[in-house]
Swiss-Prot record:
It comes from Variovorax paradoxus (strain S110). It is found in: Cytoplasm. This is Urease accessory protein UreG. The gene is ureG. GTP binds at residues 24-31. Keywords: Chaperone, Cytoplasm, GTP-binding, Nickel insertion, Nucleotide-binding. Belongs to the SIMIBI class G3E GTPase family. UreG subfamily. InterPro entries: CobW/HypB/UreG_nucleotide-bd, P-loop_NTPase, UreG. Gene3D superfamilies: P-loop containing nucleotide triphosphate hydrolases. Signal peptide: none annotated. CDD domains: UreG.
Length: 216
């Protein structure tokens, strides 16, 4: 276990914690992105994370094994049904999880909430998330951005992950980017390859700026 896991920085200002929702289809890279964000931000901010799975706590286990944060700062929630419901129509199970985490870590700067794998219609309740990040992967097909759906068109940040797979699945990244710009208009997006950490810094910068974590 690295020393970074034992060092939790002190907050410089008292503000309600920023709640960041991370959604997207199964296998798109949500958990890997959350791991990368925790590792990139944990020395600067006080972080906690909540993961959603339907019948298991597999994502919680993966983050713990990866050393994203100390185990006590990662909570797994078993939704027992449609993952969309647990982040939108009835977010009570996640709101309760946030309350429990903040009882243990009242100085948290950021609460990450990773949804279970869902479809393009998934969105986070405003009660649950201040910022939303929606993740797709190139292997799902070049056409995904132009299919639309709230995750693609309305999320605060859209992430197109696994760009390294484009040549193997016949996806044209230029076309995906053009379709993304057309569907999202002025809303930001990032192309990522999390295996090489490509794009992670841009996602962190977005969270810091839009979440007003920095004075800049």
């Amino acid at each position: 276990m690295t020393s970074a896991l034992h060092h939790i920085p002190h907050r410089t200002k008292k503000l309600p914690p920023l709640r960041v929702g991370i959604g997207g289809p199964v296998g798109s890279g949500k958990t890997t992105l959350l791991e990368m964000l925790c590792k990139a931000m944990r020395d600067k901010y006080d972080l906690v994370a909540i993961t959603n799975d339907i019948y298991t706590k597999e994502d919680q286990r993966l983050l713990t094994v990866a050393g994203a944060l100390p185990a006590e700062r990662i909570m797994g929630v078993e939704t027992g049904g449609c993952p969309h419901t647990a982040i939108r129509e009835d977010a009570s199970i996640n709101l309760e999880a946030i309350d429990r985490m903040l009882e243990d870590f009242p100085d948290a700067d950021v609460v990450f909430v990773e949804s279970g794998g869902d479809n393009l219609a998934a969105t986070f309740s405003p009660e649950l998330s201040d910022l939303t990040i929606y993740v797709i992967d190139v292997a799902a097909g070049e056409k995904i951005p132009r299919k639309g759906g709230p995750g693609i068109t309305k999320s605060d940040l859209f992430v197109i992950n696994k760009t390294d797979l484009a040549p193997y699945v016949g996806a044209n990244l230029d076309v995906m980017e053009q379709d993304t710009q057309r569907m999202r208009r002025q809303r930001p997006y990032v192309m990522t390859n999390l295996k090489t950490h490509t794009g992670v810094a841009e996602v962190v910068a977005f969270i810091e700026k839009r979440g007003m974590l920095t004075a800049d």
